[in-house]
Amino acid sequence: MKYTTLFIFIVLISIPGQIVQANKTPMDSASMEMAIALLHESDLSRGNVSGIEWDIDIESKSKGKTQRNSLRVLVKGTNALAIYQSPIKVKGRKLLMKDRNMWFIKPGLSKPVPISPRQKLLGGASNGDIASTNYAGDYTIKSFTKDQFNNEPCFLYDLKAKNKKVTYDRIRYWVSKKRKIGLKAEFFTLSGKMFKTAFFEYDHTIAVNGEERPFVSKMIILNAMVKTDKTIMAYHNIKIKKISPSSFNLNLLVR
Protein backbone atom coordinates (compact mmCIF):
# COMPACT_ATOMS: atom_id res chain seq x y z
CA MET A 1 0.00 0.00 0.00
CA LYS A 2 2.78 2.43 0.90
CA TYR A 3 4.44 1.85 -2.51
CA THR A 4 1.16 2.57 -4.30
CA THR A 5 0.80 5.84 -2.39
CA LEU A 6 4.39 6.80 -3.20
CA PHE A 7 3.85 6.02 -6.89
CA ILE A 8 0.71 8.18 -7.05
CA PHE A 9 2.55 11.09 -5.39
CA ILE A 10 5.45 10.85 -7.86
CA VAL A 11 3.05 10.80 -10.81
CA LEU A 12 1.21 13.87 -9.52
CA ILE A 13 4.31 16.00 -9.12
CA SER A 14 5.52 14.89 -12.56
CA ILE A 15 2.44 16.07 -14.46
CA PRO A 16 3.25 19.31 -16.38
CA GLY A 17 1.24 22.21 -15.00
CA GLN A 18 0.25 20.33 -11.84
CA ILE A 19 0.82 22.56 -8.80
CA VAL A 20 1.50 20.80 -5.53
CA GLN A 21 1.33 23.10 -2.50
CA ALA A 22 2.32 20.78 0.32
CA ASN A 23 3.16 23.60 2.69
CA LYS A 24 0.26 25.90 1.86
CA THR A 25 -3.20 25.91 3.33
CA PRO A 26 -6.28 27.45 1.66
CA MET A 27 -7.12 31.02 2.65
CA ASP A 28 -9.98 31.28 5.11
CA SER A 29 -12.95 33.50 4.28
CA ALA A 30 -11.65 36.44 6.34
CA SER A 31 -8.27 36.36 4.58
CA MET A 32 -9.94 36.15 1.19
CA GLU A 33 -12.20 39.11 1.97
CA MET A 34 -9.17 41.14 3.04
CA ALA A 35 -7.26 40.14 -0.11
CA ILE A 36 -10.15 41.18 -2.37
CA ALA A 37 -10.64 44.47 -0.49
CA LEU A 38 -6.95 45.38 -0.85
CA LEU A 39 -6.98 44.48 -4.53
CA HIS A 40 -10.06 46.67 -5.03
CA GLU A 41 -8.27 49.56 -3.27
CA SER A 42 -5.34 49.18 -5.66
CA ASP A 43 -7.75 49.23 -8.62
CA LEU A 44 -8.98 52.68 -7.55
CA SER A 45 -5.47 54.09 -8.00
CA ARG A 46 -5.44 52.77 -11.56
CA GLY A 47 -8.72 54.29 -12.69
CA ASN A 48 -11.58 52.09 -11.51
CA VAL A 49 -13.78 54.93 -10.24
CA SER A 50 -17.25 56.17 -11.18
CA GLY A 51 -16.08 58.94 -13.51
CA ILE A 52 -12.58 60.00 -14.56
CA GLU A 53 -10.66 61.32 -17.56
CA TRP A 54 -6.94 61.25 -18.32
CA ASP A 55 -4.48 61.68 -21.16
CA ILE A 56 -1.92 58.98 -21.94
CA ASP A 57 1.33 59.46 -23.81
CA ILE A 58 2.69 56.10 -24.97
CA GLU A 59 6.32 55.78 -26.03
CA SER A 60 7.70 52.51 -27.35
CA LYS A 61 11.39 51.80 -27.96
CA SER A 62 12.28 48.65 -29.90
CA LYS A 63 15.28 47.77 -32.09
CA GLY A 64 16.49 51.35 -32.00
CA LYS A 65 13.14 52.70 -33.21
CA THR A 66 10.87 54.97 -31.16
CA GLN A 67 7.11 55.26 -31.70
CA ARG A 68 4.66 57.54 -29.91
CA ASN A 69 0.89 57.82 -29.52
CA SER A 70 -1.27 60.10 -27.39
CA LEU A 71 -4.83 59.30 -26.33
CA ARG A 72 -7.54 60.87 -24.21
CA VAL A 73 -9.36 58.31 -22.09
CA LEU A 74 -12.82 58.61 -20.50
CA VAL A 75 -13.63 56.02 -17.85
CA LYS A 76 -16.73 55.09 -15.91
CA GLY A 77 -16.12 51.97 -13.86
CA THR A 78 -15.04 49.23 -16.26
CA ASN A 79 -16.21 51.11 -19.38
CA ALA A 80 -13.64 53.18 -21.26
CA LEU A 81 -13.42 55.28 -24.41
CA ALA A 82 -9.98 56.18 -25.76
CA ILE A 83 -9.67 58.84 -28.48
CA TYR A 84 -6.41 59.19 -30.39
CA GLN A 85 -4.95 62.70 -30.22
CA SER A 86 -1.68 62.12 -32.08
CA PRO A 87 0.07 61.46 -34.39
CA ILE A 88 -2.04 63.28 -36.98
CA LYS A 89 -2.55 60.20 -39.15
CA VAL A 90 -4.47 58.41 -36.38
CA LYS A 91 -6.19 61.40 -34.74
CA GLY A 92 -9.90 60.81 -34.22
CA ARG A 93 -9.70 57.04 -34.11
CA LYS A 94 -11.34 55.49 -31.07
CA LEU A 95 -11.14 52.40 -28.91
CA LEU A 96 -14.26 51.51 -26.93
CA MET A 97 -14.36 49.03 -24.08
CA LYS A 98 -17.81 48.23 -22.73
CA ASP A 99 -18.61 45.31 -20.45
CA ARG A 100 -15.18 43.90 -21.35
CA ASN A 101 -16.03 43.83 -25.07
CA MET A 102 -13.85 46.06 -27.23
CA TRP A 103 -14.14 47.80 -30.62
CA PHE A 104 -11.95 49.90 -32.90
CA ILE A 105 -13.72 52.85 -34.53
CA LYS A 106 -12.16 54.73 -37.44
CA PRO A 107 -13.55 57.85 -39.12
CA GLY A 108 -14.97 56.87 -42.48
CA LEU A 109 -15.75 53.29 -41.52
CA SER A 110 -19.48 52.54 -41.28
CA LYS A 111 -19.03 49.68 -38.83
CA PRO A 112 -16.90 49.28 -35.71
CA VAL A 113 -14.32 46.49 -35.74
CA PRO A 114 -14.41 44.04 -32.80
CA ILE A 115 -10.97 43.67 -31.23
CA SER A 116 -9.48 41.95 -28.21
CA PRO A 117 -8.08 43.69 -25.12
CA ARG A 118 -5.13 41.30 -25.49
CA GLN A 119 -4.13 42.62 -28.91
CA LYS A 120 -1.07 44.84 -29.18
CA LEU A 121 -1.71 48.59 -29.06
CA LEU A 122 1.83 49.97 -29.30
CA GLY A 123 5.06 48.32 -28.24
CA GLY A 124 4.49 46.38 -25.04
CA ALA A 125 1.12 48.02 -24.36
CA SER A 126 -2.03 46.00 -25.04
CA ASN A 127 -5.41 47.48 -25.96
CA GLY A 128 -6.76 46.71 -22.50
CA ASP A 129 -3.94 48.58 -20.76
CA ILE A 130 -5.48 51.94 -21.62
CA ALA A 131 -8.66 51.17 -19.65
CA SER A 132 -9.19 51.17 -15.91
CA THR A 133 -7.95 48.22 -13.88
CA ASN A 134 -10.50 45.84 -12.39
CA TYR A 135 -8.31 43.03 -11.10
CA ALA A 136 -10.63 42.49 -8.12
CA GLY A 137 -13.54 41.73 -10.44
CA ASP A 138 -11.83 40.19 -13.46
CA TYR A 139 -9.46 37.76 -11.76
CA THR A 140 -9.58 34.92 -9.27
CA ILE A 141 -7.03 35.05 -6.46
CA LYS A 142 -5.12 31.77 -6.63
CA SER A 143 -2.68 32.68 -3.87
CA PHE A 144 -1.94 35.64 -1.59
CA THR A 145 1.39 35.78 0.27
CA LYS A 146 3.60 38.27 2.09
CA ASP A 147 6.54 39.60 0.10
CA GLN A 148 8.63 42.73 -0.52
CA PHE A 149 9.37 44.98 -3.46
CA ASN A 150 12.19 47.54 -3.18
CA ASN A 151 12.22 46.86 0.58
CA GLU A 152 8.54 47.81 0.84
CA PRO A 153 6.27 45.22 2.51
CA CYS A 154 3.77 43.90 -0.03
CA PHE A 155 1.24 41.22 -0.65
CA LEU A 156 2.00 39.14 -3.71
CA TYR A 157 -1.09 38.01 -5.61
CA ASP A 158 -1.24 35.20 -8.13
CA LEU A 159 -4.25 36.10 -10.28
CA LYS A 160 -6.03 33.97 -12.87
CA ALA A 161 -8.43 35.43 -15.46
CA LYS A 162 -12.09 34.56 -14.99
CA ASN A 163 -12.68 34.65 -18.75
CA LYS A 164 -10.93 35.36 -22.05
CA LYS A 165 -12.29 38.90 -22.36
CA VAL A 166 -9.74 40.35 -19.94
CA THR A 167 -6.32 41.61 -20.97
CA TYR A 168 -4.11 38.93 -19.41
CA ASP A 169 -4.55 35.25 -18.60
CA ARG A 170 -2.44 35.27 -15.44
CA ILE A 171 -0.76 38.02 -13.39
CA ARG A 172 1.63 38.05 -10.46
CA TYR A 173 0.96 41.38 -8.73
CA TRP A 174 2.79 43.10 -5.88
CA VAL A 175 0.55 45.44 -3.84
CA SER A 176 1.92 47.71 -1.10
CA LYS A 177 0.44 46.83 2.29
CA LYS A 178 0.65 50.41 3.55
CA ARG A 179 -0.08 52.49 0.45
CA LYS A 180 -2.56 50.01 -1.12
CA ILE A 181 -1.21 50.46 -4.64
CA GLY A 182 0.16 48.04 -7.21
CA LEU A 183 3.94 48.34 -7.57
CA LYS A 184 4.91 45.58 -9.97
CA ALA A 185 3.20 43.06 -12.24
CA GLU A 186 4.36 40.05 -14.21
CA PHE A 187 2.14 38.97 -17.11
CA PHE A 188 1.89 35.43 -18.47
CA THR A 189 0.75 33.81 -21.71
CA LEU A 190 -1.86 31.06 -21.91
CA SER A 191 1.01 28.55 -22.00
CA GLY A 192 2.31 29.91 -18.69
CA LYS A 193 5.32 31.83 -20.00
CA MET A 194 6.05 35.27 -18.58
CA PHE A 195 6.24 37.70 -21.49
CA LYS A 196 6.39 41.13 -19.88
CA THR A 197 6.87 42.94 -16.60
CA ALA A 198 5.43 46.29 -15.55
CA PHE A 199 6.40 48.78 -12.86
CA PHE A 200 4.08 51.54 -11.64
CA GLU A 201 4.67 55.06 -10.34
CA TYR A 202 2.12 57.21 -8.51
CA ASP A 203 2.93 60.93 -8.66
CA HIS A 204 -0.71 62.03 -8.98
CA THR A 205 -3.49 62.12 -6.39
CA ILE A 206 -7.26 61.96 -6.76
CA ALA A 207 -10.15 62.29 -4.32
CA VAL A 208 -12.33 59.18 -4.02
CA ASN A 209 -15.28 59.34 -1.61
CA GLY A 210 -13.74 62.41 0.01
CA GLU A 211 -10.38 60.72 0.57
CA GLU A 212 -7.14 61.65 -1.18
CA ARG A 213 -5.34 58.67 -2.64
CA PRO A 214 -2.38 58.11 -5.01
CA PHE A 215 -3.08 57.79 -8.72
CA VAL A 216 -0.88 56.18 -11.33
CA SER A 217 1.42 58.51 -13.23
CA LYS A 218 3.49 56.00 -15.17
CA MET A 219 3.41 52.36 -16.26
CA ILE A 220 6.78 51.07 -17.47
CA ILE A 221 6.56 47.86 -19.49
CA LEU A 222 9.60 45.67 -20.16
CA ASN A 223 9.66 42.82 -22.66
CA ALA A 224 10.74 39.61 -20.88
CA MET A 225 12.17 38.10 -24.07
CA VAL A 226 13.75 41.17 -25.69
CA LYS A 227 15.43 42.98 -22.82
CA THR A 228 16.02 46.19 -24.78
CA ASP A 229 12.33 46.67 -25.65
CA LYS A 230 10.62 49.18 -23.37
CA THR A 231 7.24 50.93 -23.39
CA ILE A 232 6.27 53.84 -21.14
CA MET A 233 2.68 54.92 -20.56
CA ALA A 234 2.63 58.36 -18.93
CA TYR A 235 -0.64 59.66 -17.43
CA HIS A 236 -1.47 63.39 -17.43
CA ASN A 237 -4.38 65.79 -16.82
CA ILE A 238 -6.24 63.52 -14.42
CA LYS A 239 -9.78 64.80 -13.82
CA ILE A 240 -12.53 63.34 -11.67
CA LYS A 241 -15.70 64.22 -13.55
CA LYS A 242 -19.15 62.99 -14.43
CA ILE A 243 -19.06 60.85 -17.56
CA SER A 244 -22.30 60.41 -19.47
CA PRO A 245 -23.32 56.81 -20.30
CA SER A 246 -23.82 58.01 -23.89
CA SER A 247 -20.02 58.34 -24.16
CA PHE A 248 -19.93 54.54 -24.41
CA ASN A 249 -22.85 54.15 -26.83
CA LEU A 250 -21.40 52.29 -29.80
CA ASN A 251 -24.13 53.42 -32.20
CA LEU A 252 -23.50 57.08 -31.42
CA LEU A 253 -19.74 56.73 -31.80
CA VAL A 254 -19.87 55.39 -35.36
CA ARG A 255 -22.13 58.13 -36.72
Per-segment meaning from a language model:
Residues 79-80, 102, 112, 182:
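Hydrophobic residues embedded in beta-strands of well-ordered beta-sheets
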Residues 1-4:
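Positively charged n-region of N-terminal signal peptides that target proteins for export
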Residues 15-22:
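Sec/Tat signal peptide C-region and signal peptidase I cleavage site
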